[in-house]
UniProtKB/Swiss-Prot annotation:
Pfam families: LacI, Peripla_BP_1. Keywords: DNA-binding, Repressor, Transcription, Transcription regulation. This is Uncharacterized HTH-type transcriptional regulator YkvZ. The lineage of its organism: Bacteria, Bacillati, Bacillota, Bacilli, Bacillales. SMART domains: HTH_LACI (SM00354). The keyword Transcription regulation applies.
Amino acid sequence: MANIKDIAEKAGVSVTTVSRVINNHPYVSEDKRKRVFEAMESLEYTRNIHAVHLSKGFSNMIGVVLPTVNLPYFAELIAGIADAAAESGVHLSLFQTNYEVQKEIFALSQLKQRQVDGLIFCSKALADEKLMEWEGPILLCQNSDNARFPTISIPHQEAFRNGLDYLIAKGHKKIAICLARKKGMNSHFRIKAYKEALEEIGEAFREDWVIEKAITINDGKALFHKWNTWKEKPTAIFVANDQVSAGLFLEAKNQRVSVPDELAILSVDNHEISQALGITTIDIQTREMGKQAFAILEKRIQGQPIERKVLDYRLIERSTV
C-alpha cells in the first residue's frame, strides 16, 4: 500500500508538500497540487482517516446512547442528531441500552478510551451522580439539576401543567396520566405537575391512575382495556407518547367508545401518527432537539462553556379533547 513518501517521489515534491495537499493546506501551488493528486490516483492511495483523527487527538465520532431505536420519539431525535452531524462531517455510533446500566457504562467506557469524542444521552437509567464519575463531554437530552452537564430539554413540568390546565378548562376533573416509566427525570416533573393540578381543583391523587411502562401502540390498546375495567373511570387520559395515544384512540373507536365525549385523550410528541388520527397533542420539537443537542455537544468538545438550553413547546388542538 502506498504511503506519503511514495507519493512524494512519484510527484517529484517533498513529503511536506504531499502532507499539505492531503490536509487541504492553502499554501501549495496548483501545479504541485495537481501532480500530487495524479500520483495519489496512480498509486491508488487511500488516506487513513482514522489514523489522522487519532493523531490529532479526536475520533470524529459521537456516541448516541438511547434505550431503543424502535420508537418514533427516539427515531426523530436520532434523525435530528444525524442531520447536524452530517453537516459537520462527524460520524455517529449508536449504543442501544434498553435502560440496562451495564450497557450505559460500556458507552461511557468508549468515551474514556477515546473511541468517541463525546456522548449524547437521549434517555438513561444511570443517576447523574454516577455519570459524574466519568470524564469527557456528555450531554443530556433531559432536565438535570447537575450543572456539570450540558443539557437540552423542554420544561416538562410547565408543559405537562399546561396540558392539564387545558383538560381542566374543558371540564375534566377525573384525569389519569400515562408515562413510559415513573423513574425517569422527565416523569418526575410530570407527576409533580399532576399532583399540583389535582390539589388545586380539590381532587385526590390516585396512584392507580398513574400508568407506566407504556410506549407502544399495543400498550395503548391495553390501556383502553384497563380504563374500561375501572369502576370509576377518568374522563380524560393525558398520555406522554403519541404511539400509546394512537393505540388508546384506535381501541376506543374499535370498542365504540366515543372520543372525546366518553374519553378525552391528550398526548405529547406531535409525530405523524397523531396528525393522521387527529389526536390533540403537545409538540416538543423532537427533531430540533436532536439538531441542537449535537451543536451544543460539538461546542463542548471544542472547549466552549457548558450550555443548558430549553426549547419551546406548543399545544396543538385537534379532535380528541
